[in-house]
């Protein structure tokens, strides 16, 4: 007798459940997505003990016909695709027909459903076995309850985390679904306590406000663009609002939340040097495209996708964000803390946001910032930044970045009056004149410059300011076509491992494009006899070593990245440090040079250069206005 045999359906469902149903959050995701596919406009999610004890989903969707109820719990039974061609034109969130049988095989499940034009159906299933089926009176829609999850798979139950952790996983999934489908009203309850309620009016900014707080919603920048193949819409926060994790960025593809690292990377690249190292924005990006251009059938939970025109999409995202930030004022306001009024009951408010009006009715032409493209430009005269001082060896003393307090979904509502304080996002061209004239007042601790104008008080980090000036100078100088070189008094020898040597050898021609000429010296060494004149004096070998590390790490020469990193490194080393006192003339010259830069708001590492206190804020602090 042969050893290989076909598994029965119940065992097959248990095995499939291992992939589809990892934890309570998986059940919530699959059932809520089924409700959305059934054209529901209102969905309630009730949890007990983070879903381990009970999960109940109530919707007002199309419901399931009596003759389909049993079939729906069979493996690979679905109403969403019919043939292989449909697999490449998927518009629904589900399509495999795996979720319901997998969930039913590891739980006690009760289903009450009706299509509205016939009596409803009541179905009870335990561990995959049908216990009861009968007709019942029911409104249109579906009410499905999952209890005692993993009761028959104790090994899986043993690896569940704490109630708090599992609840966090569920709320994260529900938040993403709420952002993906703002046209659906979602209510989330845990142990009869309301955690989330979205209005379902289609305004995603209201959803973002209810999830991330009204304070974050006030600092959202609308993003919108369209190409031949893609349409993107969404919101991202101003650079001053960041988090320590990428988890606050959500990417939606054709209504489906997906985890895609390259999309998140494109959002970060759109900020370019506006973000501090290790900090990430809060963002929501919805992408619509022809289903033929995306493969959603590559992950058990359908959380990952593959794009057939990925590079075009990434470029569109980067350029759209860069164009958006060119048009808004990026000087962070210090703000005034006001006491929040209390409310008596928790309710989802109708938020009214005044969106910044675009200058043109159509989308502006998207252009990469000057100096950031790959094209080599003809050499031109570049003004050397004013050398106001000798760099100090003392490090900058920086204050830690303060995390903005997130809104607790359990807190009692919002005040509509807060909406009147929504910061106006002014769309102005970033052309070097964005920064208004500043008049120096003085200096504090040899580190911060105080200046004023008719709009209030400005505090400037002098190191960050000159770092931005130097960065734009070096960025323009690095990689010019007509390279001026300077001979080294003593040739510099670079010793590498065999693997490193081979990687560098492949990129010799590319390195020449940034002015670095290497000659082979022995089996695993190179020598450098000259270097570009823009290398800061005394730092030549250090910069060469940095470039070699980049080539070895990347396994290729990324000219744009080399230029960027070299310019950033040199600008930091050549800039003033903390505890260096300046004369009034030096301060004035620094501020005037800062005004000529293309981005006077952040240093190349993304830290803010200046902070603004408006006259109104100062008067409020001193109780001159109430």
Curated annotation (Swiss-Prot):
GO cellular component: mismatch repair complex
Compositional bias annotation for Polar residues: 383-393
Segment forming the signal sequence: none
GO molecular function: ATP binding; ATP hydrolysis activity; ATP-dependent DNA damage sensor activity; mismatched DNA binding
Keywords in alphabetical order: DNA damage, DNA repair
Gene3D superfamilies in the record: 3.30.230.10, Histidine kinase-like ATPase, C-terminal domain, MutL, C-terminal domain, dimerisation subdomain, MutL, C-terminal domain, regulatory subdomain
Superkingdom of the organism of origin: Bacteria
GO biological process terms held by the UniProt record: mismatch repair
Pfam families membership: DNA_mis_repair, HATPase_c_3, MutL_C
SMART domains (alphabetical): DNA_mis_repair (SM01340), MutL_C (SM00853)
InterPro entries linked to this entry: DNA_mismatch_repair_CS (IPR014762), DNA_mismatch_repair_MutL (IPR020667), DNA_mismatch_S5_2-like (IPR013507), HATPase_C_sf (IPR036890), MutL/Mlh/PMS (IPR002099), MutL/Mlh/Pms-like (IPR038973), MutL_C (IPR014790), MutL_C_dimsub (IPR042120)
Sequence segments annotated as region (Disordered): 377-413
Role: This protein is involved in the repair of mismatches in DNA. It is required for dam-dependent methyl-directed DNA mismatch repair. May act as a 'molecular matchmaker', a protein that promotes the formation of a stable complex between two or more DNA-binding proteins in an ATP-dependent manner without itself being part of a final effector complex.
Entries under PANTHER family matching the protein: DNA MISMATCH REPAIR PROTEIN MLH, PMS, MUTL, DNA MISMATCH REPAIR PROTEIN MLH1
Family to which the UniProt record says this protein belongs: Belongs to the DNA mismatch repair MutL/HexB family.
Stated name of the protein: DNA mismatch repair protein MutL
Lineage of the species this protein comes from: Bacteria, Bacillati, Bacillota, Bacilli, Bacillales
């Amino acid at each position: 007798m042969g050893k290989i045999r076909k598994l029965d359906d119940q065992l097959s469902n248990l095995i499939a459940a291992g992939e589809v149903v990892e934890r309570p959050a998986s059940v919530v995701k699959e059932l809520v997505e089924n409700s959305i596919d059934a054209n529901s406009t209102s969905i309630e999610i009730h949890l007990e003990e983070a879903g381990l004890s009970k999960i109940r989903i109530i919707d007002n969707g199309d419901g399931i016909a009596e003759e389909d109820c049993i079939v729906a719990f069979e493996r690979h039974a679905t109403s969403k695709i019919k043939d292989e061609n449909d697999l490449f034109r998927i518009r629904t969130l589900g399509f495999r027909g795996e979720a319901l049988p997998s969930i039913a095989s590891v739980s006690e499940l009760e289903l009450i459903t009706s299509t509205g034009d016939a009596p409803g159906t009541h179905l009870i299933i335990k561990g995959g076995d049908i216990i009861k089926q009968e007709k019942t009176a029911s409104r249109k829609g579906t009410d499905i309850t999952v209890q005692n999850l993993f009761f028959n798979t104790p090994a899986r139950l043993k690896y569940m985390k704490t109630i708090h952790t599992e609840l966090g996983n569920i709320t994260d999934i529900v938040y993403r679904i709420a952002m993906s489908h703002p046209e659906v009203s979602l209510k989330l309850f845990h142990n009869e306590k309301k955690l989330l309620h979205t209005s379902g009016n289609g305004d995603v900014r209201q959803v973002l406000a209810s999830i991330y707080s009204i304070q974050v919603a006030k600092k959202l920048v609308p993003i919108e663009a369209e190409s031949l193949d893609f349409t993107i819409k969404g919101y991202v926060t101003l650079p001053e609002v960041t988090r320590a994790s990428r988890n606050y960025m959500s990417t939606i593809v054709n209504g489906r939340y997906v985890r895609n690292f390259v999309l998140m990377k494109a959002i970060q690249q759109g900020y370019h040097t506006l973000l501090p190292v290790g900090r990430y924005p809060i963002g929501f990006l919805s992408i619509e495209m022809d289903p033929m251009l995306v493969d959603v059938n590559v992950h058990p939970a359908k959380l990952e996708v593959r794009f057939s025109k990925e590079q075009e999409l990434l470029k569109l995202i980067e350029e759209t964000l860069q164009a958006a930030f060119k048009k808004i004022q990026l000087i962070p306001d210090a703000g005034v803390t006001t006491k929040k009024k209390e409310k008596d009951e928790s309710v989802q408010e109708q938020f009214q946001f005044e969106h910044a009006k675009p200058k043109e009715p159509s989308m502006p032409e998207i252009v990469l910032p000057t100096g950031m493209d790959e094209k080599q430009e003809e050499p031109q005269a570049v003004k050397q930044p004013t050398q106001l001082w000798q760099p100090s060896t003392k490090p900058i003393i920086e204050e830690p970045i303060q995390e903005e307090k997130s809104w607790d979904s359990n807190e009692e509502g919002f005040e509509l009056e807060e909406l009147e304080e929504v910061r106006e996002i002014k769309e102005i061209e970033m052309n070097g004149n964005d920064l208004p004239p500043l008049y120096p007042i003085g200096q504090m601790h040899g580190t911060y410059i105080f200046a004023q104008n008719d709009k209030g008080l400005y505090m400037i980090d002098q190191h960050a300011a000159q770092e931005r000036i130097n960065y734009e100078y070096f960025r323009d100088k690095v990689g010019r076509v007509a390279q001026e070189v300077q001979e080294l008094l003593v040739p510099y020898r670079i010793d590498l491992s065999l693997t490193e040597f081979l990687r560098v050898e492949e990129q010799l021609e590319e390195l020449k494009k940034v002015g670095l000429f290497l000659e082979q010296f022995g089996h695993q060494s190179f020598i450098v006899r000259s270097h570009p004149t823009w290398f800061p004096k005394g730092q030549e070998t250090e910069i060469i070593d940095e470039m070699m590390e980049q080539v070895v790490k990347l396994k290729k020469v990324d000219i744009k990245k080399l230029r960027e990193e070299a310019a950033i490194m040199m600008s930091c080393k050549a800039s003033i440090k903390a505890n260096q006192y300046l004369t009034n003339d030096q301060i004035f010259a620094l501020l005037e040079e800062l005004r000529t830069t293309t981005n006077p708001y952040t240093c190349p590492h993304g830290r803010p250069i200046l902070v603004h206190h408006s006259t109104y804020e100062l008067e409020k602090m001193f109780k001159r206005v109430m």
